[in-house]
């Protein structure tokens, strides 16, 4: 049995374990551990585990993850989502479909301090859904807009999945944060346009609300100021080169906690709950990272990434077509697993293929398969991959965001939620097409701020 055949058998076993609902971290560790033992012996496996147990968990860039998770946990507990939705509803609520637009805007704002799609969908679902139903919005538009708005938490910086992608492909985290900003803004604009088109076709789906008084408008708008200041200090400081993401995340935690204690009566019990929740979430993330690294070593020893790259070159397939096929594969994976696991499992296979098609790891723009340097390809593919990961969160039949919102909106059938999310899915596909055709949407801002 060849090493490549062993690797393929390992992949099949991994898919089977995922299908029977074994936790992805344990599935990757089991398959990777057995594979390394078969190819190189148990002694090599034990040596790798000993090295990884320290080396993987002591990577400096990974220390940013617990901080961003804690920042999101604190933001949820002090009611920032409620303030954001109240302000956005004061701005948009008088428009037809305006309350749904307010939900999208609030999701974008909360994603800027949370970094998690499921947390954004869950938090804003509880805040905005009662108001949407009170305003007599259709169940499909109310739940569909919230499920779609939740995906903004993945791409808008800071993003946990974006950090993990940057570490996998050895990209600069700050550069990835820069690259994600314009595509994130584009998503918000496309979602707002989608809602406008829905209510244009079906006015009853999103009735017009009453304009608010000037005093109420100003009072509601003040609720945005804390989020805006936190975003400017954390992300603006990173963009300005004042500090790197790890201290920026710590500063963000301090600011959110200080605001919570000073203005919102954050209790020590709630802080303790947020810290314990962060410990559990971070432990899960690190365990998945450890399992992914074990699996990656097995696949490398089996020669699968190189075999895939060699096959791609020998196929003569145009690089852009290969990229589209890989993105479609990511969409399919999104129906089986969560976004973090998908990135950890797929990127180590897909990235070497794209590097070879582009001309190698040190390829410049001249003569490159994708007409850009491999460093730029790293950024461009990362943004595309994360958008496709977003698609998986709202794609039938296993869109996790849809299940989260459906668990909150018990009076709305899940089929209505999936029906409501379809127009937003079309908007996401349009965004993928725009970034495929105009890579500058992802590359322009890093080029301008890179100096």
What do the predicted segments below correspond to?
Residues 1-451:
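Alpha-helical transmembrane segments of multi-pass membrane transport proteins
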């Amino acid at each position: 049995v060849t090493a490549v055949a062993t690797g393929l058998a390992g992949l099949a076993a991994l898919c089977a374990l995922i299908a029977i609902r074994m936790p992805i971290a344990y599935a990757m560790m089991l398959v990777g551990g057995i594979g390394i033992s078969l190819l190189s012996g148990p002694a090599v496996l034990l040596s790798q585990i000993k090295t990884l147990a320290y080396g993987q968990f002591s990577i400096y860039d990974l220390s940013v993850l617990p901080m961003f998770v804690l920042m999101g946990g604190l933001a949820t507990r002090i009611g920032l989502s409620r303030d954001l939705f109240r302000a956005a509803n004061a701005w948009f609520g008088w428009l037809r479909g305006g309350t749904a637009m307010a939900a999208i805007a609030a999701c974008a704002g909360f994603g800027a301090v949370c970094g998690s799609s499921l947390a954004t969908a869950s938090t804003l679902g509880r805040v905005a859904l009662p108001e949407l139903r009170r305003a007599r919005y259709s169940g499909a538009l109310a739940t569909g807009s919230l499920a779609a708005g939740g995906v903004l938490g993945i791409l808008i910086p800071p993003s946990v999945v974006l950090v993990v992608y940057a570490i996998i492909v050895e990209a600069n985290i700050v550069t990835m944060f820069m690259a994600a900003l314009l595509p994130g803004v584009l998503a918000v604009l496309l979602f707002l346009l989608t809602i406008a088109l829905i209510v244009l076709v079906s006015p009853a789906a999103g009735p017009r609300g009453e304009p608010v008084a000037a005093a109420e408008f100003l009072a509601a708008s003040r609720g945005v100021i804390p989020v805006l200041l936190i975003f400017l200090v954390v992300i603006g400081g990173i963009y300005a080169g004042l500090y790197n993401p790890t201290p920026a995340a710590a500063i963000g935690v301090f600011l959110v906690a200080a605001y919570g204690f000073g203005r919102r009566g954050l209790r020590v019990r709630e802080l303790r709950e947020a810290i314990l929740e962060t410990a559990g979430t971070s432990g899960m993330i690190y365990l998945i990272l450890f399992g992914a690294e074990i699996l990656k070593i097995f696949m490398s020893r089996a020669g699968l990434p190189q075999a895939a790259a060699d096959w791609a070159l020998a196929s003569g397939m145009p690089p852009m077509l290969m990229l589209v096929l890989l993105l479609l594969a990511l969409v399919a994976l999104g129906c089986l697993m969560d976004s973090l696991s998908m990135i950890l499992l797929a990127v180590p296979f897909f990235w070497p293929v794209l590097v070879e098609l582009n001309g190698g790891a040190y390829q410049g723009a001249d003569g490159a398969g994708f007409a850009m340097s491999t460093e730029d390809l790293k950024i461009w593919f990362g943004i595309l991959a994360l958008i496709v990961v977003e698609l998986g969160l709202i794609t039938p039949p296993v869109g996790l965001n849809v299940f989260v919102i459906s668990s909150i909106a018990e009076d709305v059938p899940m089929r209505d939620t999936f029906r409501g999310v379809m127009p937003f899915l079309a908007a996401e596909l349009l965004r993928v097409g725009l970034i495929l055709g105009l890579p500058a949407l992802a590359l322009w801002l890093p080029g301008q701020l890179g100096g």
